Amino acid sequence: MSTASQHLYKRRRLINATAITISCIAALFGLFFLIWILWTLISKGLPGIGLDLFTKITPPPMQKGGLANAFFGSAIMCLLAIVIGTPLGIAAGTWLAEYGNTSKTSAVVRFVNDILLSAPSIVLGLFVYTLYVMHTGGHFSAFSGALALVFIVLPIVVRTTDEMLRLVPGQMREAALSLGIPQWKMIIQVLYRSASAGILTGILLALARISGETAPLLFTAFGNQYWSSNIFQPIASLPLVMNQFASSPYKSWQLLAWSGALVLTVFVLLVSLGARTLLLRNKIPNE
């Protein structure tokens, strides 16, 4: 090997080693802060975990209580948002993938959907406040909070459904249509079955996303210190209670905020892991 080749080889090895070192340092840097955040969350939230947390409502200052009404309110609004947003998102994604795939309208719809996907959640909350809350006499409610969350669920489900249906091999469509099956029946019985894991993954990721949203609920659900099961009345939610209690001077409220944050983090982690596991186990072949 000539001197020039040896010099070039050593230079490449040095650059490679430097790049690997920088990458490892960057990964460790991010991992360090992730572990720090999780440790802080566990150390401050774990002491407040108990039966009272899930069975008692939010207490007055300096008194013991729980977050039962907040858990219930969040569950109600998330469930309503998923129930309303999922069928609309699947229908829109199906149209994009199967009916309007080559039209100019579909390109516009995808562009608008991408904008909605990246829109700040507080803007969506203000939109629902202007569109619905103000026209009902400024009446905050769980339903208006769910409507705000629908606009977060919708673009996620639309994008996921569109992508998953387009991943289904074209041979499956051709085989079904060659048997004389109508297109709508082919979509329901063939495409949806093949893409069901991916679509369900998108729904679960949307659920994980809306579970921790605070900003859109400030202008819609507003919050409630008491137990309420009426979806047309103000209702408590876990993110709103955490926001209020974490900034308060009362240690009992701060402990509840940390405990609620821990429960929410564990829930989102489990939902995200479940969604990714489901997707990995049911990959759609590209051939």
From Swiss-Prot:
Keywords: Cell inner membrane, Cell membrane, Membrane, Phosphate transport, Transmembrane, Transmembrane helix, Transport
GO cellular component: plasma membrane
Gene Ontology terms: biological process: phosphate ion transmembrane transport
Family to which the UniProt record says this protein belongs: Belongs to the binding-protein-dependent transport system permease family. CysTW subfamily.
Gene3D superfamilies xrefs: MetI-like (1.10.3720.10)
Subcellular location: Cell inner membrane
Name of the encoding gene: pstA
Signal peptide: none
Molecular function as annotated in GO: phosphate transmembrane transporter activity
Protein name: Phosphate transport system permease protein PstA
Pfam families found in the cross-reference section: BPD_transp_1
Entries under CDD domains matching the protein: TM_PBP2 (cd06261)
PROSITE patterns reported for this sequence: ABC_TM1
Domain ABC transmembrane type-1: 71-275
Membrane topology label: Multi-pass membrane protein
Protein function: Part of a binding-protein-dependent transport system for phosphate; probably responsible for the translocation of the substrate across the membrane.
Listed InterPro entries: MetI-like (IPR000515), MetI-like_sf (IPR035906), Phosphate_PstA (IPR005672), Phosphate_transprt_permease (IPR051408)
